[in-house]
């Protein structure tokens, strides 16, 4: 009887340790293909000799505005 109780408690402790130890781990992120960023403009699109547009760089992210808005506030007129 005691052996069954102790083995059950040991199993529950082992199960909790396994779950909690793997909870905070993240999978390793895949590294994207690193290309320099460039600003899109009509002149920045190079054309191959066949006439196809190429994009050797990725578009740069737009900078977010630093304006701060109070959530739920009504606009002032």
UniProtKB/Swiss-Prot annotation:
GO terms for biological process: defense response to fungus; defense response to Gram-positive bacterium; G protein-coupled receptor signaling pathway; lymphocyte chemotaxis; mast cell degranulation; negative regulation of cell cycle G1/S phase transition; negative regulation of cell division; regulation of keratinocyte proliferation. Keywords: Antibiotic, Antimicrobial, Chemotaxis, Cytokine, Disulfide bond, Secreted, Signal. The keyword Disulfide bond applies. Residues 1-24 form the signal peptide. Pfam families: GPR15L. One of its GO terms (molecular function) is chemokine activity. It is found in: Secreted. The keyword Nucleus does not apply. Highly cationic protein that has multiple functions. Acts as a chemotactic factor that mediates lymphocytes recruitment to epithelia through binding and activation of the G-protein coupled receptor GPR15. May be a tumor suppressor; together with SUSD2 has a growth inhibitory effect on colon cancer cells which includes G1 cell cycle arrest. May regulate keratinocyte proliferation. In addition, through activation of Mas-related G protein-coupled receptors (MRGPRs) contributes to pruritogenesis by activating itch-selective sensory neurons and mast cells degranulation. Has antimicrobial activity against Gram-positive bacteria, including Staphylococcus aureus and Actinomyces spec., and Mycoplasma hominis and lentivirus. InterPro entries: GPR15L. Interacts with SUSD2; the interaction is direct. GO terms for cellular component: extracellular region; extracellular space. This is Protein GPR15LG. It comes from the Eukaryota. Disulfide bonds join 37-60, 38-57. Its main location: secreted.
